[in-house]
Every structure is written in C-alpha cells, then in structure tokens.
Amino acid sequence: MRPSGRKLDQMRSVSIEPNVMKHAEGSCLIRMGETHVLCSASIEDKPPPFLKNTGLGWVTAEYGMLPRATTSRNRREAAAGKQSGRTQEIQRLIGRALRAGVDRSALGERQIVIDCDVLQADGGTRCASITGGWVALRLAVNKLLKAGIIVSDPIVDNVAAVSCGIYAGQPVLDLDYAEDSTAGTDGNFVLTGRSRMIEVQMSAEGASFSRDEMGQLLDLAEAGIAELVAAQKAALG
C-alpha cells in the first residue's frame, strides 16, 4: 500500500493554471499533488554570447525553492551567496529537457529563460518544473508568433517529466516525498508527447534493480507522461 493510498500506476492529481503572472511572456502554476511550482518564461532579444551570429536561439532555466517550501525552513541560497550543487543540477536538467523540444533555428537569435520557483515541495519538483516550464515556454512562443516576430513555430513537441521508482518492492508511478525518501530505486523520465525519450535518470538508492524492473518503470512513465501531456493541452485550451 502506498502512503497516499494510490494505486501503483496512479498519478497524483495534476492541474496547470496558465497566465498567472502579469509581466512574464508565459507563465503557469502547476500542481502535482502537494507539489506546487510557479513557472515563468521571459524572452530576451539576444542570444547568449556563444551563439552570437549563428542564427540559433537558446532556452535555459533557473530553479529555486522558497524557504518554507519544505517542512522546515531552508536558508535562501542568495543569502548563502551560492547555489547548491542540487540546484545547479536541476536547472541544467530543466534547460536540457526543454531545448530538446525546440527547433532553435526557428527561434532565431534570442533566448527564453524559464524560471521555476517551488512554492511547496512534496517530491517530484524537477519533473513538475519541466512539465510546467514547457507550458510557460509554449505561451511565450505563441506571443512571438502572434506578433510576427518569428514565422515558423519552433516548438516541435510537448515535453513532460515524471518520477517512477521501486517502493516497498513494487514499481510505482509519480513518487511523493514519503515514497521518494525511502524508495529502493528511483528515476526521473523526460519524454516528448510522442513518447520519445529525452532523458532518463535512474539510480539504486537502497537496492539494485533489474532490466525487467527498468522496463516496468518506463512503461509506467509513458502512461504518466500521456496524462501530463493531456493536462498541458487542456491548460492551453
């Protein structure tokens, strides 16, 4: 039995509320159970220096957690004067994942920055950030298209992410914190709307896993991604 009472293949409730920020070109609030992440997309009219005069655009991400997103207060990283290794790893993952769904030549020489701020954390914050970040990105690109700033849609497919793991000896979908903190194996799966893999991160936390178990987790992830893509489409109308 899962702590939440969910079935092994059952996602947490998912909702994506678009256009929640006045100034950002794209934004949404994604809720996956008790994990809530505010995602925004900001368009910058020039690319990073390493892409100057290449005709290519860029998508990057920044990630952070509010001090009281967790059960006890975490000190702001700005107050500490540096980002943790975890934060840097997660924001690089978000950027990589979202770039995989973009034709950067169609985007042109500009950069879109995705900011993901965790309001409340209960496991799966990086996956929620990728899924919500894509919605914010899609909304920002829509504004570029509507304004005639770009003529071809650079978004080639949806991008979403979900966690899966081995909990109490059973493969489960969409781990919350109670499961994630005690899972024998856990992984993050980033897929496109067509179920093509962008990134798979799996690690044995308490017990090694078999190839068959990895396949079972991938099957769960594909089903979960399908639900998330449907939520993305519903949010966009």
From Swiss-Prot:
GO molecular function: 3'-5'-RNA exonuclease activity; tRNA binding; tRNA nucleotidyltransferase activity
Gene3D superfamilies on file: GHMP Kinase, N-terminal domain
Protein name in UniProt: Ribonuclease PH
Matches recorded under InterPro entries: ExoRNase_PH_dom1, ExoRNase_PH_dom2, ExoRNase_PH_dom2_sf, PNPase/RNase_PH_dom_sf, Ribosomal_Su5_D2-typ_SF, RNase_PH, RNase_PH_bac-type, RNase_PH_CS
Source species of the chain: Cereibacter sphaeroides (strain KD131 / KCTC 12085) (Rhodobacter sphaeroides)
Gene this protein is translated from: rph
GO biological process, one term: rRNA catabolic process
UniProt keyword Transferase present: yes
Cross-referenced Pfam families: RNase_PH, RNase_PH_C
Reaction it catalyzes: tRNA(n+1) + phosphate = tRNA(n) + a ribonucleoside 5'-diphosphate
Keywords: Nucleotidyltransferase, RNA-binding, rRNA processing, Transferase, tRNA processing, tRNA-binding
SUPFAM superfamilies membership: Ribonuclease PH domain 2-like, Ribosomal protein S5 domain 2-like
Coiled coil: none
EC id: 2.7.7.56
Residues noted as binding phosphate in the record, renumbered to the chain: R86, G124, T125, R126
Free-text function comment from the UniProt entry: Phosphorolytic 3'-5' exoribonuclease that plays an important role in tRNA 3'-end maturation. Removes nucleotide residues following the 3'-CCA terminus of tRNAs; can also add nucleotides to the ends of RNA molecules by using nucleoside diphosphates as substrates, but this may not be physiologically important. Probably plays a role in initiation of 16S rRNA degradation (leading to ribosome degradation) during starvation.
Subunit-level organization: Homohexameric ring arranged as a trimer of dimers.
PANTHER family registered for this protein in UniProt: EXOSOME COMPLEX COMPONENT, EXOSOME COMPLEX COMPONENT RRP41
Similarity field: Belongs to the RNase PH family.
